[in-house]
Amino acid sequence: MKGSWVVSTSIIRITLSFTFLFICHFSDVLAAPTRHLCRPEQKDALLKFKNEFEIGKPSPTCKMVGIESHRKTESWGNNSDCCNWEGVTCNAKSGEVIELNLSCSSLHGRFHSNSSIRNLHFLTTLDRSHNDFEGQITSSIENLSHLTSLDLSYNRFSGQILNSIGNLSRLTSLDLSFNQFSGQIPSSIGNLSHLTFLGLSGNRFFGQIPSSIGNLSHLTFLGLSGNRFFGQFPSSIGGLSNLTNLHLSYNKYSGQIPSSIGNLSQLIVLYLSVNNFYGEIPSSFGNLNQLTRLDVSFNKLGGNFPNVLLNLTGLSVVSLSNNKFTGTLPPNITSLSNLMAFYASDNAFTGTFPSFLFIIPSLTYLGLSGNQLKGTLEFGNISSPSNLQYLNIGSNNFIGPIPSSISKLINLQELGISHLNTQCRPVDFSIFSHLKSLDDLRLSYLTTTTIDLNDILPYFKTLRSLDLSGNLVSATNKSSVSSDPPSQSIQSLYLSGCGITDFPEILRTQHELGFLDVSNNKIKGQVPGWLWTLPNLFYLNLSNNTFIGFQRPTKPEPSMAYLLGSNNNFTGKIPSFICELRSLYTLDLSDNNFSGSIPRCMENLKSNLSELNLRQNNLSGGFPEHIFESLRSLDVGHNQLVGKLPRSLRFFSNLEVLNVESNRINDMFPFWLSSLQKLQVLVLRSNAFHGPINQALFPKLRIIDISHNHFNGSLPTEYFVEWSRMSSLGTYEDGSNVNYLGSGYYQDSMVLMNKGVESELVRILTIYTAVDFSGNKFEGEIPKSIGLLKELHVLNLSNNAFTGHIPSSIGNLTALESLDVSQNKLYGEIPQEIGNLSLLSYMNFSHNQLTGLVPGGQQFLTQRCSSFEGNLGLFGSSLEEVCRDIHTPASHQQFETPQTEEEDEDLISWIAAAIGFGPGIAFGLMFGYILVSYKPEWFMNPFGRNNRRRKRHTTTH
């Protein structure tokens, strides 16, 4: 008993002792000040990092992804704990910065090679997405060996990915998408064996994807869209068994779709659109049981509908548009019970309208336009309410009326039935009144009776967009116009090519109208003044009518952004009220009869105006200075402008197109324009430019036309070295395949001498390149560096004084379609290498001093004989072939040109002159003696003193 008491007492004493120590320690903790987590060297690194960039405008991409921009770094200061700063996360125990999230922080700056971010050694997450960072990724990233997530997407980073990226072996997520990276993907990326996410879309990568990418066995997302990858798709990707998303759209892949993709059994999303794939969809796709989205649009795929897809019952989106598929659509496509969107437009599908598609209850979007479907439009028995919201079946071979059963598609929001042969029956617009959700209706180019705009608009109470282009539309103005508020809410109205003669007065009450196209009609008179008072009107296309002027509005609304008035009969000065349209982005008044000078009041537009086209008018005077600083495109060709190019043009940093052709500009070559980093088209044709052009650095230039001026001198040997956009260096710069210069509502155009004739480029492809130096006084040799321009399509050096040989380096111009070196002083042989240019369809070597064998090859056999005339020393079977219809010389005769024929005629003339020379000289001497002896007044007056005066007068001028 006593022992138990001793043990209990000991336990109590020990317990009390521990309790006392705990209380004392806890008191010390309460009494001690709060410990700061942030380590000093970490704070110092972050503050230095903050000073490497500036706070600018929010990135517009943030709204696109639903993230609100916030200036996170404004909370960073010396007097606060860096672990509490916005975007900064620290390790709770060590105080080391482990995460840095600066996405959507409105930041602007460059990535420095000695960036202080390299001192954040324990950083695991770095997110600088959706800002305005630029420059190259530097080696400072290599120090961040603990990184597991790196996101630099949606910036302006450029250059190549360093091979050392493979050293970041802990990375699980790497997103570099939507930047300006270029070059090839380094094979070292295959060392990132823990990657689950790899995003490289929207850059300028080219070449082939390294096979080492097949080592990324944990990868679930691979985004490579919007680059210039080409060649064979690596079969090693077929081993990425965990891949769920594969994005390969907008590249330059060709050949057949690799069957190895069928091995990716976990694939959910597969995007292969906008490439050059051909053949059929592989049967191995039948293994993709998890696939929900498939997009193979804009390729060259063919064959019948791919039945292999019918087993993939999880498919919700299928896009086969813009291919070469044929045959009929199978009725058992209804087995795809989860199908929500089916796009098969612009193929060659045949048969009748596949009304069985309406059986699929989930179907929401259906696009079948641009096929060869025929028969009457029959929608079948639509018994249950349809979920269909989008239906486009235009541009087929359907005949007959629009069926009344369409009114049962009560959820329809967009409907396109253009190019329907209604057999001249009137359209019953009342059937559309049942479609309460209808927002967009396209009924262009119907073979129907006249549509009365005044009668049909009341049927559309909620319609936002209506396209009646290509129909015969009556817009007769009623005697009285109601002043009641409009019941319609149309925002976009397309009436192009409708035969309208008077401006539709009914539009006066359409206060919601924002987009109006009345181009290609016969509207006469003046543009009504009330049009400028519509509060929401931002786009107005008046082009190709017979307007003669503008009624001046009392007070124009400032909303107008696009004003297109080309090809009318406008006269007088450019209206001053246009200067009040301060939101104007595009102004096209080309092909009219405007006169006077360019209004100086246009200075009011300089902050927004991006595209100005005043070509083909009668404008005179000089160029105003400093009024178009934001311009992307300036075209004032075919006017009567004088003086020099304004030097203020060198400050137009956004300028891509400058066209001043056919004016009276007298100036030297504008070398100073080389400071414009975005300049792509330069046209100085048919002016009075003069002097040498020497070395001109235009790395972005795609088209240059300086023809028919007075330029002289020789071109340096290395003249074209820096013209990288026309060389192979510039081949892969753009992320998209086919694009045009211009904006969404306006495309640039120009006239260019191509293949011996003037050709109008209604739209300018961004991949189109041309050099025209013709009609000047250039001399010396053609620079060998011309051979660097491997992307060149048109080369015209004619009508100059070039000497020497045609450089064999022209044989490197594998994209060349047109070559003209005529009317020079070139000698030697035509280079055999030119015969290897498979795309060359036009060439002109005439009127030089060329000799030797004309190269063989199909390109030479398709030329005209006149392309070789004026070169006495040319011979060969190719020449005999192209000139056989002109004459057939004997085998021992030299090739005779029109020039030699003229020389023969001259010889005959001299022989005839010699025959008459003897009697003529005797008669002349006798007649002269009589005149000199008697000096008659009638002879001396007209041929003596007056003649001397005439000579002096002529010399003075």
From Swiss-Prot:
Pfam families: LRR_1, LRR_14, LRR_8, LRRNT_2. LRR repeats lie at residues 120-143, 144-167, 168-192, 194-216, 217-240, 241-264, 266-287, 288-312, 313-336, 338-360, 361-384, 386-409, 412-434, 435-459, 460-483, 487-510, 511-534, 535-557, 558-580, 581-605, 606-630, 632-652, 653-675, 677-698, 699-722, 765-789, 790-813, 815-837, 839-862. Residues 1-31 form the signal peptide. Residues 32-910 are extracellular. InterPro entries: Leu-rich_rpt, Leu-rich_rpt_typical-subtyp, LRR_dom_sf, LRR_N_plant-typ, LRR_R13L4/SHOC2-like, RLP23-like. Keywords: Cell membrane, Glycoprotein, Leucine-rich repeat, Membrane, Receptor, Repeat, Signal, Transmembrane, Transmembrane helix. SUPFAM superfamilies: L domain-like (SSF52058). It is found in: Cell membrane. The chain crosses the membrane at residues 911-931. GO terms for cellular component: plasma membrane. Residues 932-957 are cytoplasmic. It is a single-pass type I membrane protein. Glycans are attached at residues 78, 101, 114, 143, 167, 191, 215, 242, 263, 311, 332, 381, 477, 541, 544, 569, 593, 608, 618, 712, 796, 812, 836, 844. Belongs to the RLP family. This is Receptor-like protein 34.
